[in-house]
Design a protein with these regions (language model features):
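Transmembrane helix-loop-helix hairpins at the membrane interface
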Residues: 143-253
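N-terminal juxtamembrane cytosolic/stromal segments of multi-pass membrane proteins
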Residues: 1-32, 90-93
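Alpha-helical transmembrane segments in multi-pass membrane proteins
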Residues: 28-86, 136
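Structural signal for the C-terminal ends of transmembrane alpha-helices
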Residues: 48-49, 81-91, 168-173, 225-227
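Juxtamembrane helix-loop-helix connectors linking adjacent transmembrane helices
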Residues: 56-67, 88-160, 164-177
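Alpha-helical transmembrane segments of integral membrane proteins, especially early/N-terminal helices
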Residues: 23-40, 68-78, 102-121, 219, ...
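Residue-level signature of transmembrane alpha-helical entry/exit and packing/kink sites
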Residues: 30-34, 65-73, 100, 104, ...
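Hydrophobic membrane-targeting signal helices
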Residues: 48, 81, 85, 118-119, ...
Length: 253
């Protein structure tokens, strides 16, 4: 009986630990600071690359084009995030071991398989009709050339993950005390918000944004909370995208 009690307490302790960790990260931050991060998240997604610079960029190597555009995407939100969170950087940034890298790849693979199964069920039993990501329509050669740029862009996306999570947790904790309720609600709202930021990318298919984008986003935020390391969230995200690229390459050949 004592063993059963201990096993039942583990999930509760995990929720409590995650909740306490999030409290430590956001308790010294004002709503204005976190709102600034959210506004930068929205601007990062919806402010396109300056058209007047394209005539210069289009004349350079395509690999460098992707890298420059990725830097334009990631640098502003990353800079503002570090500016606001600098005093607590040691709480969310740690070195990654090789064992943790393997865990991130294996977890990304499991998430990818689950999402494939979920998508197949969704298509089979509903009228759901997905919209492909424009990147997937560029051919495998361009996809491989884009990989360095994608790696840089995912830094910005990872910053967006945690920024949105911090924002929602700060709000939720102002009126919800229960660790389980607060951290669960924060994760669901954060994943949904990040998914809905992709509405224009997926032709305003909100179901696809909430499921195909939102669910993996929640998994990546959980990964961040489990390891208390923003880099682990990034590696899970990077490996997830890498698996998608490799799978598309295998299927196309």
């Amino acid at each position: 009986m004592k063993f059963l009690f201990r096993e039942c307490k583990r999930p509760l302790n995990a929720f409590s630990a995650a909740n306490t960790y999030m409290d430590c990260l956001v308790q010294t931050k004002t709503y204005i600071q976190l709102l600034i991060l959210i506004l930068f998240c929205i601007a990062t997604v919806y402010l396109s690359f300056p058209s007047f610079t394209l005539k210069y960029i289009n004349n350079i190597d395509i690999l460098l084009q992707y890298i420059i555009k990725a830097l334009y995407f990631s640098f502003p939100i990353t800079f503002v995030f570090l500016l606001i969170m600098w005093d607590q950087r040691y709480l969310f940034s740690k070195k990654i071991s090789f064992h943790q890298l393997k865990i991130s790849f294996f977890t990304a693979f499991i998430i990818y398989i689950i999402m494939l199964l979920f998508l197949s069920v969704l298509i089979s039993f509903t009228t759901f009709n997905g919209t492909s990501n424009p990147i997937e329509n560029e051919g495998m050669t361009n996809m491989f050339l884009k990989t360095p740029g994608i790696a840089i862009q995912l830094i910005g996306e990872n910053i967006m993950f945690v920024s949105i999570l911090f924002f929602w947790h700060k709000i939720i904790r102002s009126f919800i005390i229960s660790p389980i309720t607060s951290i669960t609600t924060s994760l669901i709202l954060s994943g949904s918000s990040f998914g809905l930021l992709h509405l224009s990318t997926y032709n305003y298919n909100w179901v696809q944004c909430l499921t195909i984008i939102g669910i993996p986003a929640i998994a990546q935020m959980i990964f961040f909370l489990v390891f208390k390391n923003i880099h682990m969230g990034y590696m899970l995200h990077f490996n997830y995208n890498l698996i998608i690229i490799l799978f598309n390459y295998i299927v196309s050949n």
